[in-house]
A protein has these predicted regions:
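Short, structured segments at the rim of ligand-binding sites
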Residues: 1-436
Length: 436
C-alpha cells in the first residue's frame, strides 16, 4: 500500500473472505464436465453461493428433473451442456416463477440450428411447486461442415454466446458465431469466456463481428490448476467497497482473496469509480479498502455520462453510491436490466425515490441522477427487492442512516451468502448499528 495511506491513529479493521467467483467457476465447472475431469473435492466442502452450488451439482447430475433454483446462468449454461452431452431426457425446472421470464428462447433456437432436440414446454404452469423451463432430449450434434450461427439482433443475454462457446470445441467441426450488432451485451463477459478457453488450450479467433472456435478439448491439467485455488468474487467485492464508501466512521476492510488484477469483468468497478488498483493492493491476493481515503476521493469526483453496458450488475450499487454522494450523472447501456432477477430499472427508480432522491430513466438516455440533496423520508423506508439479491445488497448501507424495511433479505444467498454476517461484523468494529 502507498505510504500516503499510513496514519498514526488506530483505525477499526476487519478481514473478509469473499465467496468464489461466479463468473470464473460457473464456466470452469462446465468446461471440466465436458473434459470429463472430476471437480476437485474441495469444492464440495466450501459454503458456496446458490449460483455455483446449482452448477456444481446439476452439471454432474444423472437425474431427469433438475432444479436450477433462481440461477439464470446455470439455466443457460446447463441447457447447452445437456444439449450436447445428455444420454437421457432432461427437464430443467425452477421453484421461482421469474425464471420462466428470463432469457432462454434465443439460446434454444440457436442450439436447435445445431441439431439439438430441445424446447420450452407448452405450459409453464408449476408442477409440485416447480416451473418447467426447458426439456432436452438426447441427440447427436453432427454437422457435415463447419456450422455458422448468426446471433439475433437485440441479443438478450451474453450468456447465450458463452453457452455456445463453451460447447463449441466438442462439436465435430467447431463453430463460427457471427453477429451484426456493433456491440454485444456484456461483451467483457464473452471475452472472459474466450480467455478461459484459450488458457485451456482451445484455438479460437475473434474479430469485430464474429468468433471462430476450432474443434479440440480442454486441457485437463490446466483445468485442475484453475480449480485448485478458488479466487474471490469481484461481483461480491463491490459491496465491501460500497460499505467503505458509505461507512459513517473510519474503517479499513481487508479483502483477503481478491486479486486487484483479474479477468473478472466486475473488477472494472474500480475504473468506473476512478480508483487505481495500486492504491488498494497490499499483496497479490489482498485489497485494503480505507474508508477515509476512498470517501475523500469520491467526494472530489464529478461524473458525466457513463456506459455500463459491460458491467450491468454494478449498476444498482453505483447508482446507490451516486445518490448518497449527491452526484449528477447519466448512466447508459442498461436496458437489459429489465430482464434480470427482477425488473431492476423499476426497482432502482422506486427505491431511490423512497429514499428521497430524484432520478429518472429513459430508454435513449438511461438513468439520469439529479445530484440534489434527498427530501425527507418517512421511516421505516420500504425497500422493494422482488427477491433480487442485488436489490437487497445495493440498498442495505442506507440502513446506517435510515430505518429500512428490506424485502427478502435472505436473497443474498444467491451470490454472497455471508453478506449480512460480514456487514454486521463491520458494524461491530465501527460501533454503529444497522437500522433494519
Amino acid at each position: 500500500m502507498s505510504s500516503s495511506f499510513l496514519t498514526s491513529k488506530v483505525i477499526p479493521q476487519i478481514s473478509i473472505t469473499l465467496p468464489p467467483s461466479k463468473s470464473l467457476y460457473n464456466r470452469l465447472f462446465v468446461m471440466a464436465r465436458l473434459a470429463h475431469r472430476p471437480i476437485p473435492s474441495l469444492w464440495h466442502q466450501l459454503d458456496l453461493c446458490e449460483d455455483l452450488a446449482v452448477t456444481l451439482h446439476a452439471s454432474g447430475s444423472s437425474e431427469e428433473c433438475i432444479s436450477v433454483g433462481a440461477s439464470g446462468t446455470a439455466m443457460r449454461l446447463l441447457t447447452a451442456l445437456f444439449a450436447l452431452t445428455t444420454e437421457r431426457e432432461v427437464l430443467l425446472v425452477s421453484p421461482v416463477r421469474r425464471m420462466t421470464e428470463r432469457p432462454l428462447a434465443q439460446l434454444i433456437a440457436l442450439l436447435t440450428q445445431l441439431g439439438a432436440d430441445l424446447a420450452q414446454p407448452a405450459s409453464q404452469e408449476p408442477v409440485e411447486g416447480l416451473y418447467p423451463l426447458v426439456r432436452i432430449r438426447p441427440t447427436s450434434l453432427q454437422q457435415k461442415g463447419l456450422p455458422t450461427l448468426t446471433l439475433p439482433s437485440g441479443l438478450e443475454s451474453s450468456q447465450t454466446v458463452t453457452a455456445l462457446l463453451l460447447i463449441a470445441p466438442y462439436l465435430p467441426h467447431g463453430l463460427v458465431l457471427r453477429w451484426q450488432d456493433d456491440q454485444l451485451p456484456s461483451a467483457s463477459y464473452i471475452q472472459l469466456t474466450c480467455s478461459l478457453m484459450q488458457a485451456c488450450g482451445i484455438d479460437l479467433s475473434v474479430d469485430r463481428h464474429g468468433i471462430y472456435v476450432a474443434p479440440g478439448a480442454y486441457c485437463e491439467a490446466t483445468l485442475t490448476r484453475l480449480l485448485s485455488h478458488p479466487i474471490g468474487d469481484w461481483s461480491s467485492a463491490q459491496y465491501p467497497l460500497q460499505w467503505a464508501l458509505m461507512a459513517p466512521h473510519p474503517c479499513q476492510l481487508l479483502l483477503t482473496n481478491v486479486p486487484a488484477q483479474s479477468l473478472q469483468p466486475d473488477a472494472r468497478a474500480l475504473d468506473l469509480l476512478q480508483i487505481s488498483s495500486e492504491w488498494l493492493s497490499t499483496s497479490d491476493d489482498t485489497l485494503c479498502l480505507d474508508s477515509e481515503f476512498l470517501q475523500k476521493h469520491l467526494r472530489e469526483l464529478t461524473f458525466g455520462s457513463l456506459s455500463l453496458s459491460n458491467n450491468p450488475d454494478f449498476a444498482p450499487t453505483l447508482i446507490a453510491l451516486l445518490l448518497y454522494y449527491q452526484k449528477k450523472a447519466q448512466l447508459r447501456g442498461l436496458d437489459l436490466l429489465r430482464l434480470k432477477e427482477s425488473d431492476r430499472i423499476a426497482l432502482i427508480l422506486r427505491n431511490g425515490e423512497q429514499l428521497g432522491y430524484q432520478l429518472t430513466y429513459e430508454t435513449e438516455s438511461g438513468f439520469c441522477l439529479a445530484g440534489s440533496a434527498p427530501s425527507s423520508v418517512h421511516t421505516p423506508v420500504p425497500i422493494a427487492t422482488d427477491a433480487d439479491h442485488r436489490m437487497v445488497m445495493a440498498w442495505a448501507p442506507f440502513a446506517w442512516y435510515h430505518q429500512l424495511q428490506i424485502e427478502t433479505p435472505q436473497a443474498v444467498e444467491k451470490s454472497y451468502p455471508t453478506f449480512w454476517r460480514d456487514l454486521r461484523k463491520l458494524c461491530e468494529v465501527i460501533e454503529t448499528p444497522l437500522y433494519i
